[in-house]
């Protein structure tokens, strides 16, 4: 019985470690230089998550994984990606409002897919929606 409990706890711990999430927000230090009588103003951080892209291989190779499912209901847009076996590694790219800074993470082998829920009632320009939640597992 003790071995079964230990095995179950280990399996749960490994499952918990096998999730990858984009941070909800980031802080970016910007520095602008202007000539003349101009004054630089900055918007208040944090910058919220507005986009999720999955790549088959490094993002620089631009092999985007197409969503498997896109559903719209009750003010939400639900997007799912399946991650089949690939010779290249999958990468997750997280985009944020009001910045060109993005975060990228190599997804561990064995990930089956990613899911994101966007809030259709909150947009940030350039047709980007607020991400309510997302996870790859």
Give the role of each language-model region.
Residues 13-17:
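N-terminal signal peptide c-region/cleavage motif recognized by signal peptidases
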Residues 18-137:
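Mitochondrial intermembrane space
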Residues 1-4:
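Positively charged n-region of N-terminal signal peptides that target proteins for export
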